[in-house]
A protein has these predicted regions:
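C-terminal catalytic/acceptor-binding lobe
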Residues: 86-87, 91-160
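Conserved catalytic core of nucleotide-sugar-dependent glycosyltransferases
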Residues: 6-103
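Active-site acidic Asp-centered loop
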Residues: 1-4
Length: 160
């Protein structure tokens, strides 16, 4: 996998910071976007914010469409923009012991990436996760600037 970068702003950080609370909202993420179509010229963006499907800890669904500028409770998220109070990890240790929390797990249909697995373990420990949809950051990914992108950009409307 190529190098990934997230760029933030003071405004996004302030929204996440002001939304956090050591007891009620010990973990708050901002929002960035990902795509399942990384090799295509024009990637369809989806928020890296998910809810569990039918309580299954290995099945997730995008929170899409994304509510505008809202603080919402979610099941899991990407790990690119996270503010976490140390109480969250203390609670995880009470439930899971001293183990590795940031690793991939499962195979096939039960494969989950390291960020989703971290939040899965956090969820199982009873630590709530919130996302602020107004605290958006750029997720720098590789994509081609080619004719498909050109057509999409310029034929979208009749710009001079």
């Amino acid at each position: 996998m190529g190098r990934q970068r997230h760029t933030t702003t003071d405004e996004a950080l302030k929204l996440v910071w002001e939304s956090a609370d050591p007891i009620n909202r010990p973990v708050v993420t901002g929002t960035y976007f990902i795509s399942k179509e990384n090799e295509r010229s024009l990637m369809a963006p989806y928020p890296a914010v998910f809810n569990w499907v039918d309580g299954d800890e290995y099945k997730i669904a995008y929170v899409h469409p994304l509510p505008a500028n809202a603080l919402i409770r979610v099941g899991t998220a990407g790990f690119g923009f996270v503010l976490m109070h140390r109480n969250a990890v203390a609670q995880m240790r009470k439930v899971h012991g001293a183990t590795t929390y940031f690793n991939e797990t499962g195979v096939g249909e039960q494969f989950v990436s390291e960020d989703i697995n971290f939040f899965r373990l956090m969820y199982k420990a009873g630590v709530p996760l919130y996302t602020h949809t107004g605290a958006t950051v750029k997720h720098m990914k590789r994509f081609a600037l080619d004719v498909e992108y050109y057509k999409f950009f310029w034929e979208k409307d009749e710009r001079p």
